[in-house]
Every structure is written in C-alpha cells, then in structure tokens.
C-alpha cells in the first residue's frame, strides 16, 4: 500500500528512521513508509491512502482535493477529541463537516473512537496506536534510576498540579520537562529540564525511577508509552490507552489523587511491587505497541 501524509509542514519526502525528533505523526509516517506533502501540494501520482491532520486555522480544508489523487482519505486526530470546541462556532461546524467527509477517521484511544462514532455517525472510525520508532533512540546508557518525573507543568492541560502533589508525597525533588505554557515561579517547586528533541528526551527519561502523569487531556499518550518502553512504572489517569494497556496496576480514576498517592508510596517502598510493574510495562509495550502491531488497523483499506 502506498501512503501519503498531508500536513501544514513545509517539507516534501520521507522521514528517516533515525530522525532525532520522532513525534507521533513522524512515527506514523515512518511505520507506513509514507511520503509527506504540504497540504497545498499536488502529488504527481495516485496513492492508495492519504492521511491528513485537519488544519486548526482552516478546518474547512477541502478533502475532495485529496480524493483526486488518493483512493481513500483519512483524517488523523490531533490533541484531545474536544479540542475543536474552543474554535469559533463557524469553525466548529467546518471541522465537523470535514470529519464527516473523510473515508476514515483515525483516533488515539478507545474513548476517542466512541466519541467520534457518536458525534459523526461515521462508519469507519479506527484506533491507530501510538508508537515509537526505536531506531531513532540508539544505545541507552546503563544508569541507576533515581527520583520521580512528571509529564507536564502547572496548567490544566497537563494536570501538572495533580502530578506534583502525588510525586511530592514521596519525593522532595520533583522533575518535569519544560513545556510551552510555562507558569511564573515553577522553578520554586520543580526542577525543569531544558527543551530537548525526542531522542534526547528518551535518554533523559531513562535516568528516572518513577513517572507520574495525571493528565486529564487524553491524546496520543506518549509519556506513558515512553515510560513503558523503558520499563519505568508510570501512574496515570484512566481513559488513555497507553496508560491502561501498559501500566494497568498504576491506572487510577480521574481525580483519585488519594489512590495515586498510595501507589507511589508502594512503588517507592516495595521493590517487589516496583519490579513487577516495571516488568509488566515492558512486556505489555511489546505486546501492544511494537511497530509490527501498528499496521493492524489498516487491514481492509
């Protein structure tokens, strides 16, 4: 199957398997051996499948144009399924109409599938797994993992305050990656990592013993996935596939901070529980998220 990707990015061609910044859509492109085009480009050949991310500033993007050179056209979810409801009403309607005109809707989680099926009554909504292109990582150093890292800062999008309260209940020092929406005074409570590309991030994450990511904004779930690949137990909220499938013993109901505190205490004080969660995360990553599993939802296209 020949696949093309259409986004607002300006380059044309394929992403190498060793790309240093292998974010979600790049990983999809690599796994599908897809050629990338800017959404304004006109390919000089016909593709079996075209996948596009609906532009935020132009949600009325004309999928009929893509159908001229793609036998089927799919839209890829980006961000939480409710994100478009912060658009103007006009653009919300345009976004909805673009969704319904696609042949396939690819989504991140089982809960997203339920949402989009109900919203659009679309007959072909598929969960397309998040994945990691492991070639890009290279060799990891043997390190003695220490401390705790959270998946985001102090904004509601990342649920950073929830994560901090849980992490700080067992660890005096809490580390977090620097995010785009930085809050004044964050450095007084947490150690912020500098901005880094995806490869650098994986190598840095490998130094930590426990992950906490109590993020209510469910999308691709890369933090829980990255932790699972490394065998780092990660505490997170229910509703995110990567969290539930890779860290089932560490998944709590949204808002159940008390249960999360109990889990981090047990991880920190019971080597038996920690080692079991670590082993389980690695094994379940291989079962659910290795690259070979990714293409299973393309059958029948």
Describe the residue ranges of each PLM region:
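N-terminal pre-catalytic "stem/leader" segment of glycosyltransferase-like enzymes
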Residues: 1-63, 249-253
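Conserved catalytic-core segment of nucleotide-activated headgroup transferases in glycan assembly
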Residues: 17, 21, 134-198
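Active-site proximal beta-strand in glycosyltransferases
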Residues: 49-54, 64-84, 106
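Membrane-proximal helix-turn-helix segments that form the acceptor-binding/catalytic region
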Residues: 87-105
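Donor nucleotide-sugar binding/catalytic pocket of nucleotide-sugar-dependent glycosyltransferases
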Residues: 103-117, 121-138
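Acidic donor-binding loop of glycosyltransferase active sites
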Residues: 206-219, 232
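Conserved acidic donor-binding segment of nucleotide-sugar-dependent glycosyltransferases
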Residues: 248-258, 265-271
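A charged, aromatic-enriched C-terminal amphipathic alpha-helix characteristic of glycosyltransferases
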Residues: 269-301
């Amino acid at each position: 199957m020949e696949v093309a990707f259409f986004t607002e990015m300006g380059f044309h061609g394929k992403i190498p398997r060793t790309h240093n910044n292998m974010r979600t859509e790049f990983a999809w492109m690599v796994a599908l051996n897809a050629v990338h085009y800017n959404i304004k480009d006109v390919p000089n050949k016909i593709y079996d499948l075209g996948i596009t991310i609906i532009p935020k500033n132009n949600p009325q993007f004309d999928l009929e144009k893509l159908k001229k050179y793609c036998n089927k056209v799919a839209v890829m979810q980006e961000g939480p399924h409710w994100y478009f409801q912060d658009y103007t009403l006009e653009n919300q309607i345009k976004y909805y109409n673009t969704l319904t005109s696609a042949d396939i809707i690819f989504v991140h989680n089982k809960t997203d599938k339920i949402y989009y099926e109900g919203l659009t009554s679309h007959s072909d909504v598929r969960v397309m797994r998040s994945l990691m292109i492991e070639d890009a990582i290279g060799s990891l150093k043997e390190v003695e993992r220490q401390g705790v890292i959270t998946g985001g800062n102090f904004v509601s999008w990342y649920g950073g305050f929830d994560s901090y309260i849980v992490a700080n209940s067992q660890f005096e020092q809490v580390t977090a990656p620097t995010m785009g929406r930085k809050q004044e005074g964050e450095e007084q409570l947490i150690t912020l990592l500098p901005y880094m590309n995806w490869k650098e991030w994986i190598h840095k994450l490998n130094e930590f013993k426990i992950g906490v990511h109590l993020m209510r904004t469910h999308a691709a779930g890369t933090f829980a996935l990255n932790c699972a690949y490394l065998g780092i137990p990660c505490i997170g909220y229910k509703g995110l596939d990567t969290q539930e499938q890779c860290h089932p013993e560490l998944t709590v109901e949204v808002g159940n901070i008390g249960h999360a505190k109990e889990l981090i205490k047990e991880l920190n004080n019971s080597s038996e529980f920690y080692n079991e969660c670590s082993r389980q995360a690695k094994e379940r990553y291989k079962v659910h998220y290795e690259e070979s599993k990714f293409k299973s939802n393309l059958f029948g296209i």
